[in-house]
Amino acid sequence: SKLANHLSPEDRQLLEEHTDMVRQFERELKKSKADDAHPTPTLEEGIVEQNEQMPKISRMQTELLVSAFQADFTRVATLQFTNSVGQASMTWLGIQERQHTLSHKPNSDTDAQEKLTKINAWYASEIAHLAQRLAETPEPGGSGSMLDHTTILWTNELGEGNSHSHKDIPWAFIGSGLGFKGGQMVDAGGVPHNRLLLSIAHGMGLTNLSQFGNPDFCSDGPIQGLS
């Protein structure tokens, strides 16, 4: 108030508006703290980004993701395991060779194929764990579980590692968030994945979109029969 007495009417008005904004921000912070009823995940300390810690890091990232959804900090998240040329060794599965090296072995190499199957089964178990965590977490402010209102999209950037083929890339959808029908396998007949991404956009309510990425691959619209 002392400062306001030395200001012009115009500057006094600006000061009052700024003060009101700060007070409103304080009220929102207090309300946010009062509404903060979601549990904070308990994460093990001292976990560093090392190959052997990958299983623990996976579970920790999953807990952070579920907690972020539960608190409505975000509604979209990406969970990525290694990268396209990742050199992880799944030693906890008894496999010493690096996954990327194994992925370039020919299909006739039965030992490599068995190990890759074991590795992919581990990835699947981590996605299943994410789905289970969402399924056992009630939807905040709604009905059912968070999985009922979420869709997990699990995919890979290649259809086959040793040839770097982009054909027959697998896409798995888990959950009911987009309204897609579950419990089915769909052979899309080799159509560009742009059309699937367009289907996802439509499932999120963006039905005004007619293309996703290169328009040359979207002329036939979204893939039919998913919902």
Please annotate each region the language model reported.
Residues 1-227:
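Ligand-binding pockets and gating/stacking loops
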